[in-house]
Amino acid sequence: MKKIIVFFSVFFLITAIITGKKCREVIQKIDTISTENTTNILIKEATTEDKKKTGIKQLQKVRIVIMSNNYTSIYHSSLTLKGDNLKVYYGKNFAKQKGCKKVSLDGDSSYFKNSDVVKIYGKTGITIQGHNTENGSPVYMGELYLYREQSGMVVVNQVDMENYIAAVISSEIGEESPLEALKSQAVCARNFIMKSKALEYEKYKANADDSTDFQVYNRIKPGKNSKKAAEEIRRCEELLCVHPVLGTL
């Protein structure tokens, strides 16, 4: 019986080593990446305070405050949003819904009549008209939450982690960097946002804003390389969750 137990233990360990080889290579290469990396963050295992069976809990979505042009303010006096088949949720508990391709809002908009928060969703993304970046107005995936304040509207983008990471990679180091450098940036970005505590945005339950105070986000449209790097690191971290022992090999 003891020999059988030893045999299976060795078998599963070898299997874990083989399947996790590529992931460990990615993490190990971080130590050799040039200090020219624009996000100067220590590379550590991406974990949160809430640890369960695997010891790691993944953030599925992040919430990012979208600042005005030139990062001068978090407040927007007026907004025009565009997208294919936008859905606008408003009223108490978002009870009302309206479909459209374009919506304009300011602090006096009827959408804010019974609530100070409006949620907007676009399946293929949402464009903020006039919100210019290096390559034109960015497209925001996920949902935009608009909070009415005395100084203007605060915009929070709730987005899947991988879409966020891809848009950070393209904005921080560019789409043309080598894939291994993009992967390393993805690890940096994931680690940073999972540990970020933006106390100034606690009211909006936001993890960060899109400026250099945190991580530059969605200023340059992510391409296939940034998306590939974000996805590969996601798969690596999932494997490390399934086989935590790989983190110590």
Regions found by a protein language model. Name each.
Residues 2-249:
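Conserved, single-site charged/polar hotspot
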